């Protein structure tokens, strides 16, 4: 709309993440080629989120497809504050800075408690990774765990058990998207 009619709009298109890129990839490429701006929201993403239709309908590949489009910025947030930071940045880049990019963001349908935003994590959220939690027992081993999207909560539960029962130390890194880490 901004190119043809000089009307600024930031559209939001929500689709089933498992099928979205498979079924409309040509249109997504056309959107990239025509310098479209907006948000694609891939709903019920991930391999561990609640899937009402079984394993065959779980999305484990849409971010790989998104990585092939140069002006598509993709994210896989786990918490509401991450989504808020990403949306604010996206609106700023597309509307205020007039960048010809669009965003692909996957979301989940699990109901869980969301933590407060950690101090000074916004830059890490946008770059693709930030330190989320440390487990320090002064053990001999310290493991670096990287978690993205739906699997993060399960990874935190495993880290709690290993830390408490076995004295293993961890740094838990919250990866909001591997694609942006690769680009960097």
Predicted features along the sequence, with ranges:
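Thiamine diphosphate
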Residues: 1-68, 82-88, 91-184
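Proline-rich intrinsically disordered, low-complexity coils
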Residues: 11, 77, 115-118
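General beta-strand structural signal in soluble alpha/beta enzymes
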Residues: 13, 41-43, 74-78, 106-107, ...
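Glycine-rich, acidic/polar active-site loops that bind/position phosphate-bearing ligands
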Residues: 71
């Amino acid at each position: 709309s901004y190119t043809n009619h000089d009307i600024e709009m930031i559209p939001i298109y929500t689709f089933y993440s498992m099928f979205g890129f498979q079924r409309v990839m040509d249109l997504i490429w056309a959107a990239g080629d025509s310098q479209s701006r907006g948000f694609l929201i891939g709903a019920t993403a991930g391999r561990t989120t609640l899937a009402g239709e079984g394993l065959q309908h779980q999305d484990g590949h849409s971010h790989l497809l998104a990585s092939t489009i140069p002006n598509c910025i993709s994210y896989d947030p786990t918490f509401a504050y991450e989504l808020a930071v990403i949306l604010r940045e996206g609106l700023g880049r597309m509307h205020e800075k007039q960048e010809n990019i669009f965003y692909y963001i996957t979301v989940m349908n699990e109901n869980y408690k969301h933590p407060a935003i950690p101090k000074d994590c916004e830059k890490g959220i946008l770059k693709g990774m930030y330190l989320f939690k440390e487990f320090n027992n002064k053990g001999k081993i310290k493991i670096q765990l990287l978690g993205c999207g739906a699997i993060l909560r399960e990874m935190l539960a495993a880290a709690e058990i290993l830390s408490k029962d076995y004295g293993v130390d961890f740094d838990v890194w919250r990866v909001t998207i591997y694609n942006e880490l690769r680009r960097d």
